Amino acid sequence: MCGLLALVGHAAGAITEETVDTVAGASHLMRHRGPDEPGTWADDQVVLGFNRLSIIDIAHSHQPLRWGPPEQPDRYVLVFNGEIYNYLELREALRAEFGARFATDGDG
């Protein structure tokens, strides 16, 4: 099971470099939950931390997951602990219906 954490500030600008460092330190303490890869992401109101236990696409599916249009690639950011067992079928359906393109086998 992966380890994840989030800190949400109450106002714009609430997240400082010190806050990000604190979350990174807390994430480091949870490295046994996901020893394969740590990751953090922050903006001025939210910090996400993640320790990945790799199952699918071990080399390329990094977290936090980021998605968005080319002009705003970090529009959506997500940490996720779980496995979608029918991901191949979902991928094909998204390709067929919406022309979706994927970057990796785990699309992270």
Annotate each language-model stretch with its function:
Residues M1-G108:
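N-terminus-centric sequence/structural signature that marks the extreme N-terminus
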